[in-house]
Amino acid sequence: MSNIIKALEEEQLKSDLPKFAPGDTVVVKVKVKEGDRERLQAFEGVVIAIRNRGLHSAFTVRKISNGEGVERAFQTHSPMVDSIEVKRRGAVRRAKLYYLRERSGKSARIKEKLTKK
């Protein structure tokens, strides 16, 4: 029975997702239905948490909008998530960046990860 479930879940996994980690700044384009038409809405922010559970994987993105912190959780393999674009890699030493919720201003900044060429 579980082999059938695994096979069905593997069919629905997205393969075109970029590699991203906590601390990275990403732009998530989400399909939003308004009335009878559908459009893409971009949500740009810092990834503060990732939950890897196969088809049930999720990640949380945090941004500051009009001086107010906004967090949004996305299902990684959801059909509502159109695309994920990594804008900037962040150098952090934690898997969950919940401490950013209490920080504001310069203390909430994340250093950029230096990559070898």
Curated annotation (Swiss-Prot):
<dbReference type="InterPro" id="IPR008991">
    <property type="entry name" value="Translation_prot_SH3-like_sf"/>
</dbReference>
<dbReference type="GO" id="GO:0006412">
    <property type="term" value="P:translation"/>
</dbReference>
<comment type="function">
    <text>This protein is located at the 30S-50S ribosomal subunit interface and may play a role in the structure and function of the aminoacyl-tRNA binding site.</text>
</comment>
<dbReference type="InterPro" id="IPR001857">
    <property type="entry name" value="Ribosomal_bL19"/>
</dbReference>
<dbReference type="Pfam" id="PF01245">
    <property type="entry name" value="Ribosomal_L19"/>
</dbReference>
<dbReference type="InterPro" id="IPR038657">
    <property type="entry name" value="Ribosomal_bL19_sf"/>
</dbReference>
<keyword id="KW-0687">Ribonucleoprotein</keyword>
<protein>
    <recommendedName>
        <fullName>Large ribosomal subunit protein bL19</fullName>
    </recommendedName>
</protein>
<comment type="similarity">
    <text>Belongs to the bacterial ribosomal protein bL19 family.</text>
</comment>
<keyword id="KW-0689">Ribosomal protein</keyword>
<dbReference type="GO" id="GO:0003735">
    <property type="term" value="F:structural constituent of ribosome"/>
</dbReference>
<dbReference type="InterPro" id="IPR018257">
    <property type="entry name" value="Ribosomal_bL19_CS"/>
</dbReference>
<dbReference type="GO" id="GO:0022625">
    <property type="term" value="C:cytosolic large ribosomal subunit"/>
</dbReference>
